[in-house]
């Protein structure tokens, strides 16, 4: 068997997320069907990040196995040909060791969350960022973010449907940068809880609106209660950037 590692980008707006689900179109299903069309093999694709409906990716990593060797550049061309009806594309493919696993071999995952912060919406960024019309206090958000760095119990920031065995996660990066009318939040960790990034963003926006003081983020973290945190930020602003191995 030959194991292939591919890097994928997609717009999640019209898709049901990464994971295959009955009755809806997912990124996993689109790619698995494309691979079957040129290889004749039914494969199972394993992804580094199981993104939700509406979430985008610029560097999602996945792997699959084929019984016969195909040149990586031909795989890229073939997949991109058969996924053309959808906003999904592969921009890298390489052979990987048989013990490589896109999900379990990853040592870190990186996300960006985009906020358009101006009085009027951005047509160009429709469904690609969270538009917030009122000015956000970025220094206050940065101050609040510092409380979340490191190893913590992130129960307050996990979805009620989260299936992770433990709420303990280590947030290694949470940087907030304002560039003109756009605010970007950069987050990285070995792994994340379901909705963790979006719940963190929703809570930091309450700080940015001066509804909460920066110090309240520490109280929310210590509460270990989802009801203590802010709303879940829209999926449209979230991007899976890359996985490190």
Swiss-Prot record:
Pfam families: PseudoU_synth_1. Its EC number is 5.4.99.12. It comes from the Bacteria. The active site is at residue 52. It is an enzyme of class 5 (isomerase). GO terms for molecular function: RNA binding; tRNA pseudouridine(38-40) synthase activity. Substrate binds at residue 111. The keyword tRNA processing applies. SUPFAM superfamilies: Pseudouridine synthase. GO terms for biological process: tRNA pseudouridine synthesis. InterPro entries: PsdUridine_synth_cat_dom_sf, PsdUridine_synth_TruA, PsdUridine_synth_TruA_a/b_dom, PsdUridine_synth_TruA_C, TruA/RsuA/RluB/E/F_N. Keywords: Isomerase, tRNA processing. It catalyses: uridine(38/39/40) in tRNA = pseudouridine(38/39/40) in tRNA. Homodimer. Belongs to the tRNA pseudouridine synthase TruA family. Formation of pseudouridine at positions 38, 39 and 40 in the anticodon stem and loop of transfer RNAs. PANTHER family: PSEUDOURIDYLATE SYNTHASE, TRNA PSEUDOURIDINE SYNTHASE-LIKE 1. This is tRNA pseudouridine synthase A.
